[in-house]
Structure formats: C-alpha cells, structure tokens
Amino acid sequence: MKIVKDLEDENNRVAASDPGTVTALGVVRAFLKNHPVMCYGGTAINDLLPKEDQFYDPKVDVPDYDFFSKTPQAHSVIIANQLKAHGIKAVEVKPGMHIGTFKVFADYTGVADITHLDDVIFDRLWKEGEVRNKIHYVPVNFLRMSMYLELSRPRGDVSRWEKVYKRLTLLNEAHPVTCKKDPQTERTELTEQQQKGVIRLLRSEPVVLLGVSSAQIHLNQVWTTPIGLLADGPTIERLTAGEKTEVFEESDILPKRTTVLDSAGKKTLFRFYETTACHSYHKMQNGVKVASIPTALQFFFAYMYSGAHEEKLASVLCIAQRLVEIANAKPERRFAVLTPKECIGTQESFTEMKRDKAELLLELSKNKSSKEYLEYFFTYNPDDKAGKKKVKKQLQTLKETTPEETSRSSK
C-alpha cells in the first residue's frame, strides 16, 4: 500500500535527520577512516556501486555499519568513548547475536557491528580490498561470496532473498567477475568406469557433488579429479575410513575438509567438505545430487581467500566467472531454478543459536575475567566508572597469547 510506504519513508526520514543519530554516525565514519577495519554487508555493497545504482538514500536510510576487525573489543571501546565525548548520553557495547560480533549502541540505537576475523584472513582481504573516501571495504568477490552464501541456504532467512538477489545483480553489473586468462590447470579426466563409480557413490550416499566437479555439470564439461564432495561429518568419516587422507580444520570462511589421496599419497582423488548449514542442491534424473550454482559459487569465492596457490586461484576465478554468467542467463542454465528447496546439512535456527549462546554464556560466566569469556561476551559502558578502570586489564588479557594458541598458529 502506498500509504504504508509513505509513512515508513516519513518515519525513516525523521530518524535519519535526528541530531543524535547524525552525530553518532559521523563518529563511526571518522573511526572507519582512521583504523584498520574493513566494511562489509549492505553498506559496503551500496558504497561500491555507482551513484545511480545505490539503494540507500542518506536522507531516508540510517546506514548499518558492519565491519571486520582483528580486535573488535578494543575498537568498540574506542567508538564508545568517542560517542560519549561527542555528547551522546546513553552509550553501550554488548555482544551481538553471532559469536565474535559486538554491537555499539548510541541512545539505544545500534550504530556499529564489529566482527572478529582471523588475522591471516583479515590480511588477505585487506590486501585485495577496496578503498573509498579513506574507508576500507572487503574485496568485491568477498561480498559476492556472502550473498551467494545466503542464496544457497533454503532453510535460512529466505525473506531476504529478493533483496539480496537484487543487490547481487547490481554488484555483478558494476563489478563483473573477470579472470586475466584461463590457465590450463593440470587435471586428470575420469574414465567412463571411474565416473560410473562416482555416480554410484552419489546415488547411494548422502553426498553432493561440489566445487569444480559441480561446475562441470552446470557447464556440461567432462568430469576431472579431484572430485569435490559435500557431506556431513559422520558420513565423511565413514566414507574415508581406511583411506590415505589429509584433514584441514575449518577457518572463518571455509569448513573442515578432508582430502583422499591415491595409494602413493601424492595425488588428490576426492576432496570432502563438511556441511555447516543446509546447502542447496539439484537432483538429476540419474539420482546424482549436484550443488546449486549459489552453493558452488559460495565455496569458490571462499576458496579464494583460503591461502591457495595463485595459479589455482586463477583457474577457480575463471570457472566462477562462467558460473556467474550462467546464473544470470536463465536460458543457458541446466536447471531452471537457481536455488532449489532441497538441501544437505543442518541449518541452525535462530532459537537454536540463542540456546547455544546461552549455554556458552552459562559455562564461561564461571570466570568472567578469562580470555574466553571476553572473546565472546565482552561488554562496556563508559558511564560505569568501575568498568572503565577494569577495561584496560580486560583488553590486555585479550592481547595475551596462550601456549595452546601459539602451538596452533605454528602448525
């Protein structure tokens, strides 16, 4: 209804012009220009689009600043103190819904969401990121990955799909996926007998074809090794039992993965990825389950920031470029529906997330001065004098590296 839209715009315009909100957002923008953080999310997408394509109207919309930081607790304290210094009365830092995210509130309105990102991945993104008006943004391909991730999860918040797809289309038009060349990566074609064996596996087990293998289905190409597969943890353990394997633990952007090697232990035959949500797939007439284009692209773009060799990244980017072209051209797609309802894995519900977080809080609250507690449940209020004295010690605790962490980082 037009009257509803008009009333919403009027209310939003009042909120956007509120002096306190204008001041608070000015403080956040100034912080972004002067600290090593990277914006992502809707505001980042909007800011990287041409003016005529931007979907946020500064007169109507209050920006939602989401950004990555190596030290979100310390950065949230800086913003909170600056907000207080600029006359904002009620300022507070609280843990966000997602573990590792901290929300800064100014007069009870959220003005910044700061999320921790692993140092190694942060540095990779920083190196390839975009800079506009002194503000750093994650690379465009990382933004693409985040949107394909949402579109690949039919058990997630599907109410956002239309908005996400529109933004993705605008971003792809403004910043097309390009690869400098199509390198001839050495891959071995499967024999007819080998392909039949893989098909039997895909038909009889709860496993989905992923990665280059799934792209070859969408692009009608010959199958090659290594075969990429998606399955839950117990299935992967069962199928790889007794095989020569290498296991790579999960990171902030890629799940745990297990590679199956040949008898000599030199060549990778299969690469299993563990499910982290309910990832969409298509079921072919022969019973083979193949990852949807959004699922495949989400993993492709995540792989780009996993530390893989440059020549492998070039090959992956060229495949991703072709998949994006196919996704945007319905007549060329092998499957009419971009994201099907069928999916593999378990999608954690909002209620389950809240329950898990509450259980973690209960456990870590036994020692509120511990590093683990502060990493997940740090809070700060500049009006709390006792808290202000305590925060320096807390931030110092967060800087300290335990022997276990040193051991993990050296592996």
What do the predicted segments below correspond to?
Residues 1-23, 132-196, 359, 371-373, ...:
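N-terminal regions immediately upstream of nucleotidyltransferase
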Residues 21-73, 192-238:
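Active-site nucleotide-donor binding segment shared across nucleotidyl transfer reactions
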Residues 72-86, 232-244:
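Amphipathic alpha-helical segments
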Residues 81-123, 242-286:
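Conserved catalytic core of two-metal-ion nucleotidyltransferases
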Residues 127-128, 153, 157, 273, ...:
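Short, solvent-exposed beta-strand/turn patches at coil↔beta or beta↔helix junctions
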Residues 129-147, 287-307:
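Phosphate-handling catalytic interfaces
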Residues 178-184, 330-405:
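Eukaryotic intrinsically disordered, low-complexity regulatory regions enriched in Ser/Thr/Pro
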Residues 301-303, 311-344:
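Long, C-terminal catalytic modules of enzymes
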